[in-house]
Amino acid sequence: MNDTNEPNTEIENAEAVADALAEWWHASARDLPWRFGRATPWGVLVSEVMSQQTQMSRVVPYWNDWMERWPDAVALADAAKADVITAWGRLGYPRRALRLQECARVVASDYDNKLPRTYDELLALPGIGDYTASAVMSFAFGERIAVVDTNIRRVLSRVFLGKESLGGAASPAERALAKQVLPQDDASKCRRFDRPSVVWNQSVMELGATVCTAKVPLCEACPVLGIACFCIMVVRDWGNVARGRVNVSKVRIVRCVGWC
């Protein structure tokens, strides 16, 4: 289940970070077709499966064509396997397409073509893991739930702990941190994509994908610069990092005095 114990670390700047990221998100978020309430829950799930290990910019045309051809679970469930593989195109890992079709068949037959609305039911669907179930709960249904992927782990670790996240699967401490800093939702926010927890999940993920990247982070463009626990600096020449000429794995990480 998506549940963790609370971390031991005292977090003092979570509200300030959330406010800064929300402002940045509303001004700078990429206008992807499944965002801002424009896609069905099924469409959101399709986008999440397609985006696994694939850049979102590559996903958009495939998602548009896919949803026009198979707009719901019933349509995909009835499709020929060869057509499904062909439509997946160059997204990579075609097994994902077949698992998505298996998922569609379960949704069509067991849930009357409506995506289930609980985390446990989503997790039980073919090909759906913790991240995808949590993402659908947040992005499609507006539920307050911590979403944890590689980008979110990296951002939260850098911003709140002043260190890099470890590789591999998310640790219990990382999941606990994600749960601890998740904003409370405002009952007055009726639209699911406006709820603070949803904006938080999407903005942290977006920051990790576009600014707080793994190897060449754009610290000077970070909306939480001055709040975050550390930035990445080159001992002598920051410009080479900004131009992508220096691998951050070979750069000294500096905890910025006065930020935390």
Question: What is each stretch, according to the model?
Answer:
Residues 98, 155-156, 238, 245, ...:
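Small/flexible residues
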Residues 1-10, 29:
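Short, contiguous pre-domain boundary segments
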